[in-house]
Regions:
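P-loop (Walker A) phosphate-binding loop of NTP-binding proteins
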Residues: 30
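Hydrophobic positions on the alpha1 helix immediately C-terminal to the Walker A/P-loop
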Residues: 38
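Post-Walker A helix-loop "phosphate-sensing" segment adjacent to the P-loop in P-loop NTPases
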Residues: 44-54
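Conserved lysine of the Walker
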Residues: 35
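Hydrophobic anchor at the beta1->P-loop junction of P-loop NTPases
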Residues: 27
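ATP-dependent small-molecule kinase phosphotransfer cores
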Residues: 58-125
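Small-molecule kinase domains that catalyze NTP-dependent phosphoryl transfer to phosphate-bearing small molecules
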Residues: 112, 140-216
Length: 216
């Protein structure tokens, strides 16, 4: 009878492990630090461990709301622009996002992701939010992530001269150091266009993140 109990107990722990490994991951860092690039290599690493993941971003919903305006007024598609055009409309996006957040004490954009996150978790897919930026309100993006047993990865990037890419605006400057201080992982990587090289370079960090997933 005791042996049977131990078998059941071990089986229970096994299923708990399977359930808890499917959690939410957030990536934070200033603009141009490589958050989407890091997501791509993290996704590849998790796939090698037989874990599915999918990118989510608060900014995608923001772009959906603003895109018709920017295309009409500036001939800029927020989902396709880069370089000069992206920097041109960035202040507009920041201001619009801030207005929505101020009206809801930080909950507007997180509420947009709630259903998407739930659907992914039901399918055993790990949601990875690539633009966690705010820790101002009680229920802000960081608190939302943690309320879901999430882990936060802070990313920064070195330039060729050894300096770190600075915040792009006042909003980033006010939040980035705070988010770095509470992040579960803080990673600083080199500027490099070779994602395969970055993948090999980040192996230790990727293993640490994977181990943390298994512990939660």
């Amino acid at each position: 009878m005791q042996l049977y109990y131990h078998k059941i107990n071990n089986l229970t722990r096994y299923f708990i492990l399977i359930i808890m490994i499917v959690m939410i991951i957030g990536i934070t860092g200033v603009a141009r630090c490589g958050k989407d690039t890091f997501y791509s290599i993290l996704k590849k690493f998790l796939e090698e461990k037989q874990l599915k993941s999918q990118r989510l971003a608060f900014a995608d919903d923001l772009k959906n709301e603003l895109n018709s305006f920017t295309k009409d007024k500036f001939n800029i598609d927020l989902f396709k622009c880069d370089g000069t055009d992206k920097e041109l409309v960035r202040p507009l996006m920041v201001a619009y996002g801030k207005c929505r957040r101020s009206q809801t004490e930080g909950k507007y954009w997180t509420s947009k992701l709630d259903i998407k996150v739930e659907n992914l978790l039901k399918d055993n897919i790990i949601p990875i939010v690539t633009d966690v930026r705010y820790i101002e309100y009680r229920d802000d993006e960081y608190s939302w992530l943690k309320s879901r047993n999430g882990i936060l990865i802070h990313l920064s990037r070195k330039l060729d001269d050894g300096s770190i890419i600075p915040p792009a605006n006042i909003e980033e400057k006010a939040n980035d150091n705070k988010l770095k201080a509470v992040a579960d992982f803080s990673i600083c990587w080199e500027t490099c266009q070779d994602t395969n090289f970055l993948y090999e370079l980040m192996q230790k960090n990727l293993r640490n993140i994977y181990d943390r997933l298994r512990l939660n």
